C-alpha cells in the first residue's frame, strides 16, 4: 500500500513477482490517506495496481473505518471495482466487530460485496481481538489475517529488556 514507504515497496514487489504471479496471493490497502470516498478508494487501488504492474490484486483491504463517508458510497465503488475484476476478496483492517457487521448489513441490503477477511492487530501481547473480533469472525465465517504478529519487533528481541527508563528516555 502507498502508506508504507510511499509505494516503493509495491514497485519492488511488482518487479519481483512478475514471473510467479499465479503462485502468490497479492494484497493491498487503501483509505488510510484521504479516507474511504469512492473516488479515493478507486484512485488508490488503481495507483497500487500501476506500481505493482498488475491488473488485479487477490485481496483489497480498506485500511480503517471512515466516519465521514457513507458506507453505501464506499461499497458501491467496491462493487464496481470487483465487477471490473480489480480485486476478488474484500478485507477490512482496524474495524471493530460492530463496524464489520454494519458494513456487511449494507452490503447485503444493496447486493454489494461483503467483508471476506479481517485484519486486526493480534499477537501474544495485544490480544484484544480475542474479545469480539475473533468470535465474530468465526460466527460470520470471515477469514482473519492479523497484522503486527511480532508486536512491532517487541517479540523478536529488537528491544533490550535490560535497558531501564530514566528521565532522559521517557
Predicted regions located by residue number:
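Short, acidic/polar
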Residues: 36-53, 73-76, 100-105
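Active-site groove signature of glycoside hydrolases
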Residues: 49-70
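Structural motif corresponding to the early beta-alpha repeats
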Residues: 19, 23-39, 63
